[in-house]
Amino acid sequence: HDVLSRASAVYGVPVETIVAVWGVESNFGDISGKYPLLQALGTLSCEGRRQSYFRGEFFATMRILQRGDLREDQLKGSWAGAFGHTQFMPTTYEELAIDFDGDGRRDLVSSTSDALASTANFLKKRGWQTGQPWGFEVTIPADMSISGESRRNKKSLSSWVDRGLVRADGSPIIQGGLSGSLQAGLMSQIGRAH
């Protein structure tokens, strides 16, 4: 728990969020993939519609090995090349992995400290705003059409307020320092728009 508390303090991401990502991505490190990354990414870089993308991931994997942070036998992951406790792609690893345990290596496979801090760093660098909610439940007016709405079809919070949305408890959407200009989309409980 000390590692999580420190990572949360350094990067401003709640412990619960870091743990949620860890649980979703690898069942807390139990399932991180079985495919050798060099072979998987080498194959994907030579066939299919995303060859260029996977070629970049393949060469990033080679650089990880060259740097010595991980050994080839440690680099096993998903068929698409994500690896470690929180399933980083090799280019994301290069950009955002952290040596949080101070051993001189960024090891997202064997070091839970490095993996969880790197996850918090990833979220922070990708726009996590400390103290702001990632989302909240809302009540949609019965007469409001939500056809075509999704988490990708974002509108300002003020726009959602103008359309009659309130939080599930009946309180206003805009509160606690949230800006009315903040962009937000709708998600259902199963991850699809209503």
Where are these regions (language model features)?
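Extracellular/periplasmic bilobed ligand-binding domains
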Residues: 182, 186
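Conserved small/polar residues in nucleotide/adenosyl-binding loops
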Residues: 193-194
